């Protein structure tokens, strides 16, 4: 509860939640949604609740920052993990051309930056493998075929 008393973003978020604001409604001139406020405050519990109610986790504010940027700016590994697990786009750039990873590095949170770098690499590898997976499915279908040309000497050809 001490955190609630000393963080103005939490007060704003608490007010929004009490008044029944839409989860994606930009409540202030900076167009920050409750998800932006939760991520920017490092409040994983509020963020999780917002995500469970259908909040847009890629919504950008007037600075072009998504909730992922806000979490990276404050070094909240918990919020970053929640957003990444919910399929937030990690390659979004703000109006200064910075990704969340860039912000984590520039704000002095190397562990968050390394986490985002790892996720980006994993997503890149996964996207490169996707066409290969389709090819593998086709090859597997061929392997399951028992045509006379494919099945010789008790072994199936690829």
From Swiss-Prot:
Record motif Nuclear localization signal, residues: 129-149
The ANK repeat ranges on this chain: 1-25, 30-59, 63-92
Membrane keyword on record: no
Main localization (coarse): nucleus
InterPro entries attached to this UniProt entry: Ank_Repeat/CDKN_Inhibitor (IPR050776), Ankyrin_rpt (IPR002110), Ankyrin_rpt-contain_sf (IPR036770)
Lineage of the species this protein comes from: Eukaryota, Metazoa, Chordata, Craniata, Vertebrata
SMART domains, sorted: ANK
Subcellular location: Nucleus; Cytoplasm
Source organism of the structure: Bos taurus (Bovine)
Any single Pfam family the record assigns to this protein: Ank_2
Protein name listed in UniProt: Ankyrin repeat domain-containing protein 37
Protein modification: Ubiquitinated by the CRL2(FEM1B) complex, leading to its degradation.
């Amino acid at each position: 509860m001490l955190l609630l008393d000393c963080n103005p973003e939490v007060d704003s978020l608490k007010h929004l939640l009490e008044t029944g604001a839409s989860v994606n409604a930009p409540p202030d001139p900076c167009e920050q949604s409750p998800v932006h406020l939760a991520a920017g405050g490092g409040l994983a519990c509020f963020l999780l609740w917002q995500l469970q109610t259908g909040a847009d986790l890629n919504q950008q504010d007037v600075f072009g920052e998504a909730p992922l940027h806000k979490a990276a700016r404050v070094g909240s590994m918990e919020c970053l993990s929640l957003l990444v697990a919910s399929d937030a786009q990690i390659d979004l750039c703000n109006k200064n051309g910075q990704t969340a990873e860039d912000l984590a590095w520039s704000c002095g949170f190397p562990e968050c930056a390394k986490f985002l770098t790892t996720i980006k690499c994993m997503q890149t590898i996964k996207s490169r493998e996707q066409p290969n997976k389709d090819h593998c499915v086709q090859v597997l279908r061929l392997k399951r075929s028992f045509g006379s040309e494919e099945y010789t000497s008790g072994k199936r050809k690829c």
